[in-house]
Each structure stands twice: as structure tokens, then as C-alpha cells.
Amino acid sequence: MHDKILILDFGSQVTQLIARRVREAHVYCEIHPNDVSDDFVREFAPKAVILSGSHASTYEDHQLRAPQAVWDLGVPVLGICYGMQTMAVQLGGKVEWSDHREFGYAEMRAHGHTRLLDGIEDFTTAEGHGMLKVWMSHGDKVAELPPGFALMASTPSCPIAGMADEARGYYAVQFHPEVTHTVKGRQIIERFVLQIAGAKPDWIMKNHIEEAVAKIREQVGDEEVILGLSGGVDSSVAAALIHRAIGDQLTCVFVDHGLLRLNEGKMVLDMFEGRLHAKVVHVDASDQFLGHLAGVTDPEAKRKIIGREFVEVFQAEAKKLSKAKWLAQGTIYPDVVESGGTKTKKATTIKSHHNVGGLPETLGLKLLEPLRDLFKDEVRELGVALGLPPEMVYRHPFPGPGLGVRILGEVKREYAELLRRADAIFIEELRNTTATAQDAAAGLCGEADVGKSWYDLTSQAFAVFLPVKSVGVMGDGRTYDYVTSLRAVQTTDFMTAHWAHLPYALLGRASNRIINEVRGINRVVYDISGKPPATIEWE
């Protein structure tokens, strides 16, 4: 039996990251709404409780509170941002609106040598104070500590940035240790979970395979399942996991919607029919998809259309399978959280994902999502544990709507042809270029990265088609052609990301090849936006 950490979600967009950090410590955790009952909390029997952040205000919203059972259990509790504020209010402290709202990096001083922060620091001041580089995102602040609490951390703008009641194991921080922007955040959460809570680090993907296979068999029984296979990491791992559980009861439906990468269809069929010996049905529905997308420019509308058409294709294929009762998808945690689909339904929607936003209530198939609770790196670990080849497992993620969300505005067959060729050139240059000692010296990568391909050193890379034209010169003639943007990011969880600092020579070669080899594109730009404020995909 795994030790469990209970994460109470107050509606933050990054609550899922808390779960990821806990699981990185190999400890099992679950996310549940903040308004679960006292009986639920007691029956869950957590080793510790973590209270998430929220876009709400403790000063204004008196309904968002943790169940009383959290404070009655006698287990350690960690409050993060809003979680700190509700802890303060519920235990007798005071919270007030701050005149100075903090959003972004801050340098925080630790106080009191608490079990949570003692010895964890990014640098020390001339006076010997331990300092942490943290990520803040709050408007309210704790103005008065609850009885029994001591100051644990502060910033110039937030005098009480952390508080602790060591006797009861209650800790709270105003910053977000779960995001990668907080340099030592992972270490802080790991210390809370392993040392303060004393949870056993026995959550590993091999264990998850056994549990997931058993759950799939229990859900499906002797019924048949169809799965939309895109060739991406998520659908591939989902297919392998389901195939292990139910074998030939699974039929993979590979839909060519006209928005795939270059030569992707052949690769997918060779991989799944040849290597995994899975049943694969190939459906060419490009005319259907592109026809419905004609004239549509709104990103949300495009995603909804693509999701709807996927469902219609699946329903048509399901009718040919007498026992097909289930539609399987490679939905993962980031898909759910960015669609406002956390279990609390309190997160603010950023964009709809076709996996969760395009399914009508009238769907005649039940939904099977075996990866729904996993992050991308967990999915990759699971794929390796299932025996999938590295070239599949470590391939960069590709969105379900395909090139449909990488072509800004209206989707046309002509645009898709230009984009897939430009994208293939960029990916080829990334694969064929290795990091050098000079790159490391320039700070573009670490010394341990020298010799690795830049494809492996980036988490996701692709080209984006911009439906605008610019003037250029080719030979002695004037050109008036389209623009493409190259995008490459580095991230550990895909919830936050930094733009990749690629060598200029690599970018130069990619740009030169695209302009010379892809007739119709005469200008290439590079996207240097992080997430946040931008999302990884442009649409």
C-alpha cells in the first residue's frame, strides 16, 4: 500500500505541478477539490496535506477553505500561496490586500532555520543570510501570524513570505515551489514529503503498469476499444499500455486529417503494425477535415472542429466493430488542466484541447483515458517500462489537432504543405547538430550536454506558418512570400517553459535551407517567448 499525499485544489492553474513534484520524489499523491468532506479526508488517511494556490482571494472569498479535518488529523500540512493565506485565516491569523502585488521573480530571505528551509539556499548575503530565488504570484498577503507560528521567510515587498508551526508540522510559503522558476522548489517539496511527512518513496512506473493494466481490464471487460493513433508520445504509450492489458480487443485508428508531419503516416504504420503487431485501421479523412476548417480562423473554433471530426470518424469506425464500446485517448494532465478540467472545475480556461473539449455529450462510446493522471515525463518513463523504442518515446510531442494549430488563422492544404516541409528541415537540423564545448562556454547548454543533439536538448521544437507575406529578393528578382516562425522550448513538465537558446549557426542553416528549399516562404523568424506568458503552441 502506497503512502499518500492529499493535495487540495483551490483552483490554481499549476496545482498539477505540485503533484508532479511529489511524484518526482516517488511518492503517490492525489488531487481533490478543497471542498471535500471531513469524512473523505479522514478516509483518505494522508501522510500529509498540501494546500494549493488559487486565482481567488482569501480576503474576499470566504467559501474557499480547507476542511476542518485537515487540522484535526495531526499530519503535516504545507500551504502554497493561497494555501498559506487560508491556513493563516483558518488558524487565527489575518490576511489583507497588498498595496504591492508580486508577480515574477523575487529574492527571499529564510528565517529561523526551520526543518523545511534549513540549509536550502541559492546564495548568501554579505551578512550571512540564506537567500532563495523564488516565483511569486499573489495580491493578498498574511498580515498577522496565527498563534503558534513563527516567521519562516520574507521579501522586501512581503514581510511574511513564509511561516511555520514546527510543533504541529504546519508550513506555508507565499511563493510557488512547484514551478521550475523557483530554483530550489523541487528540493523544498521533496523535503516536506520525505523528511517532514516521512512518506515512503515507492511510487515508480513499473508499479503503475500493474495497477493501470488491472484497472483497464476491470473497466473494459471483454468489450472492444478503439484508439485514435497520432504517432505522438501520448497516444503511442496509451496504445502500448492498453494493448498489454487487452491485446486484440484494441483497434488503433490512424486518422490522416491532412495536418500530419512529413512522412508521418508511413512511420506510424511501420511502427505499430510492424513492431507492436497491433491492429491498425488507416483512415484518410483529409478532405473531410480541411473542408470543415475552410474559412475558420478562430483557434478555439478550429480545435473544436478538429475534435468533433475525430469523434465522427471514430464513431463511423466503431460501427464496423460489433463489440466496440470504448474510445481511448492519450489525454495527460496538462491537457486537462489547460482546459479548465481539474477535479474542482475552478481553474481558468486557457485553451481547449481536442482530447477533452471536442467530445459531445451524445458520444456513443465510453471514454478510456489511462494516462489522464500522468505528466509528460511520467508518460515517457511508462513508455520505456513498456518496452517502446526510444525514438518513439522521446519524440517531441505533437498536438492532437496537428498542424491545424500551427497554421495561424484559416487552414489551407497549401499552407499545410509549406509548413510540413519547413518543419521537417528545422527538425533535421536539430537532430544533425550536436552541442559543442563552445556552446557550453557561451551558456547555451551545460558541460554534460556536449555531444548531445540539439533535438535531444530541446523539449519541443516546430515551425509555425504565418499567413502574412513579406518582400524578399531571390537572385535578381523580387519575391512576395509567406513567413514561418521557428519555436523551440526547454521544460521539465510542459506547464512552464523557457525558449531554447539555440546556436546562431544552427538557426542560420535552418533559415537558409527553408528559404531555398521551400518555394513560397521567404522569411524565417525565431520565437523567444517563454511560458508563461505565452503558451508553447501559438494557438
From Swiss-Prot:
Domain Glutamine amidotransferase type-1: 4-202
Catalytic activity: XMP + L-glutamine + ATP + H2O = GMP + L-glutamate + AMP + diphosphate + 2 H(+)
Organism expressing this protein natively: Burkholderia cenocepacia (strain HI2424)
Domain of life: Bacteria
Gene3D superfamilies referenced in this protein's UniProt entry, alphabetically: 3.30.300.10, 3.40.50.880, HUPs
Function of the molecule: Catalyzes the synthesis of GMP from XMP.
PANTHER family associated with the record: GMP SYNTHASE [GLUTAMINE-HYDROLYZING], GMP SYNTHASE-RELATED
Assigned keywords, A-Z: ATP-binding, Glutamine amidotransferase, GMP biosynthesis, Ligase, Nucleotide-binding, Purine biosynthesis
GO terms assigned for molecular function: ATP binding; GMP synthase activity
Entries under Pfam families matching the protein: GATase (PF00117), GMP_synt_C (PF00958), NAD_synthase (PF02540)
GO-annotated cellular components: cytosol
Descriptive protein name: GMP synthase [glutamine-hydrolyzing]
UniProt EC number: 6.3.5.2
Domain GMPS ATP-PPase: 203-395
Gene transcribed to yield this protein: guaA
Alphabetized InterPro entries for the sequence: Class_I_gatase-like, GATASE, GMP_synth_C, GMP_synth_GATase, GMP_synthase, GMPS_ATP_PPase_dom, NAD/GMP_synthase, Rossmann-like_a/b/a_fold
